[in-house]
Amino acid sequence: MIITIFGPPGSGKGTQSSLLIAKYNLKLISVGDLLRNIISSSSELGKKIKGTVESGNLIQDEIICGLLRDQLALVDDNCLLDGFPRNLNQAHFLTQVLQEKYNRDVDIVVELQLDDNIAIDRLKNRLACLDCKNIYSVSSFKSTTCAKCKSTRLEKRIDDADMSAINKRISEYHLQMKGLREYYKGKLLTIDANLSVDEVTQEIESKISCNLV
């Protein structure tokens, strides 16, 4: 089974992806994690990507698609793609690569739909563990140690630090989603991401079960 999950910033893609790969025994390919790892390497590419991310702009398709192709070469056709594709061009690329490698396309597309104001509030308060990638809200999580892996490396993401960049990312997401919804019509599961984590998980699993019948 090949699943892709996307949604606006703050919609809980990473959280739901972690739960889904455990539930369905899938390999995870997270574009966001790949980019953050490159940024932390301080390479020339990392510096270039960091500048793009901090301004709220999208990374060039050529870079994203190259990273994805490399990752797909390492997994079989039981995987979940977190945050990819982000536009119609990337969707066409993904179809081409999957057809070449597995003679198939994506099976299920999960879209997490989130109110913009809630997204902004979540991003302003988001705190991430640099080691296990667990996410917390600074308004409710007061510890300096990650509850999951006990790391003390808790930080705000660089792309959450600037309000104008946040607004730009959300606007760009809505703009790109129009074409993606049409492209994946028939495979698209729309989920209310304004709900609690458990409620969102239940809705996703219920709709996936119905889709697999």
Swiss-Prot record:
Residues binding Zn(2+), per UniProt: 129, 132, 146, 149
Any single GO CC term annotated in Swiss-Prot or TrEMBL for this entry: cytoplasm
Group of enzyme by EC: transferase
Alphabetized Pfam families for the sequence: ADK
An example molecular function term from Gene Ontology annotations: adenylate kinase activity
Catalytic activity, reaction form: AMP + ATP = 2 ADP
InterPro entries reported for this sequence: Adenyl_kin_sub, Adenylat/UMP-CMP_kin, Adenylat_kinase_CS, P-loop_NTPase
Domain of life from the UniProt record: Bacteria
Region of interest (LID), residue spans: 125-160
Residues that, per the record, bind ATP: 10-15, 126, 135-136, 195
SUPFAM superfamilies in the cross-refs: P-loop containing nucleoside triphosphate hydrolases
Similarity remark: Belongs to the adenylate kinase family.
Described purpose of this protein according to its UniProt entry: Catalyzes the reversible transfer of the terminal phosphate group between ATP and AMP. Plays an important role in cellular energy homeostasis and in adenine nucleotide metabolism.
UniProt protein name: Adenylate kinase
Organism listed in the record: Wolbachia pipientis wMel
